[in-house]
Swiss-Prot record:
CDD domains: nitrilases_CHs
Annotated Pfam families: CN_hydrolase (PF00795)
Name listed for the protein in its UniProt record: Nitrilase 3
Family (UniProt): Belongs to the carbon-nitrogen hydrolase superfamily. Nitrilase family.
GO molecular function terms listed in the Swiss-Prot or TrEMBL record: nitrilase activity
Region (Disordered): 310-330
């Protein structure tokens, strides 16, 4: 049975620099490749960084200030030199890489998850379908085209970001599509220990229901970085310690390694796919333990288009001259 060496990566972005953060990610992919890692998950929108500032700034402050503008400037276009660099690093390491970026498409930002196969090919670009609370001031909404599991060199991979793990239908879409490895991403630092505890519930429950491995990555900010990007604007809210929970969960919902709760590093675990079969013999949520004739999910995986073109058809008589359109005399 197949065994895949997987890594959940806890890493700090280089604030306000897309290029420096990408360089750091590329270096980490190389290091993991030297350790024989075949699959790696990086944190939510780690390139260039998660918009932590939006948790404490009002809409007016975001519009008149510089934080949102800087993020727009440093965001990632897909494809671009930034994505090319990550793909090339994945190719050189022979590694499947799942990573979160702030994607810029025109004048709109999206919380986007990218998946690169071991040959460096970008095989999935999905956007968070519903940004959470204050995130809606920053990101647009994604569509259903990315709510699917994708075949890769290491198996079928599904991706969700942060509070999407509280959407049971989104999770079931991936379960029913046969994901074997679930790549979960959260922002981590600055949201408190309660955030980490709820995250643990989310990812362990998803592993239990899906019968898949969950490789979960959170980002780390040190105290100086938190003070730099999260400024108390008078609402009495500032940085909160805690919020990281980088780990890997087995298909039966049990933790396979002690989670990283602070600092940079990675959790590396060998994923024995026999464990998937053992779990699904007991409970296959999209198979023998389901009743699709009673309960089923409808999903629209159509990619959203802002313009829909229709072919022009001549109106009856439009090709006739004025003389031809006269009403015949009685």
């Amino acid at each position: 049975m197949k065994v895949v060496k997987a890594a959940a990566v806890q890493i700090s972005p280089v604030l306000y620099s897309r290029e420096a953060t990408v360089e750091k990610v590329v270096k980490k992919i190389h290091e993991l490749g030297q350790l024989g890692v075949q699959f790696a998950t990086f944190p939510e929108t780690v390139v260039p960084y998660y918009p932590y500032f939006s948790a404490v700034q009002t809409g007016i402050e975001l519009l008149s200030g510089t934080e949102h503008l800087r993020l727009l400037d440093q965001a990632v276009t897909v494809p671009s030199p930034a994505t090319d660099a990550i793909g090339e690093a994945a190719r050189k390491a022979g590694m499947v890489v799942s990573i979160g970026v702030n994607e810029r498409d025109g004048g709109t930002l999206y919380n986007t998850q990218l998946l690169f196969d071991a040959d460096g090919t970008l095989i999935q670009r999905r956007r968070k379908i519903t940004p959470t609370h204050f995130e809606r001031m920053i990101w647009g909404q994604g569509d259903g085209s990315g709510l699917r599991a994708v075949d890769s060199k290491v198996g079928r991979i599904g991706q969700l970001a942060c509070f999407e793990h509280n959407n049971p239908l989104a999770r079931y879409a991936l379960i029913a599509d046969g994901e074997q490895i679930h790549s979960a991403m959260y922002p981590g630092s600055a949201f408190g220990e309660g955030f980490a505890q709820r995250m643990e519930i989310n990812i362990r429950q998803h592993a239990l229901e899906s019968g898949a491995f969950v490789v979960n990555a959170t980002a780390w900010l040190d105290a100086d970085q938190q003070a730099q990007i999260i400024k108390d604007t008078g609402c009495g809210i500032g940085p909160i310690s805690g919020g990281c929970f980088t780990t890997i969960v087995a298909p039966d919902g049990m933790l396979m390694a002690e989670p990283l709760r602070s600092g940079e590093g990675e959790v590396i675990v060998d994923l024995d796919f026999t464990l998937i079969d053992r779990r699904k013999m007991l409970m296959d949520s999209a198979g023998h333990y389901n009743r699709p004739e009673l309960l089923s999910l409808m999903i629209d995986r159509t990619a959203t288009a802002h313009v829909h073109e229709r072919a022009a058809h001549p109106v009856s008589g439009a090709e006739q001259g004025p003389e031809d359109l006269r009403t015949p005399a009685a």
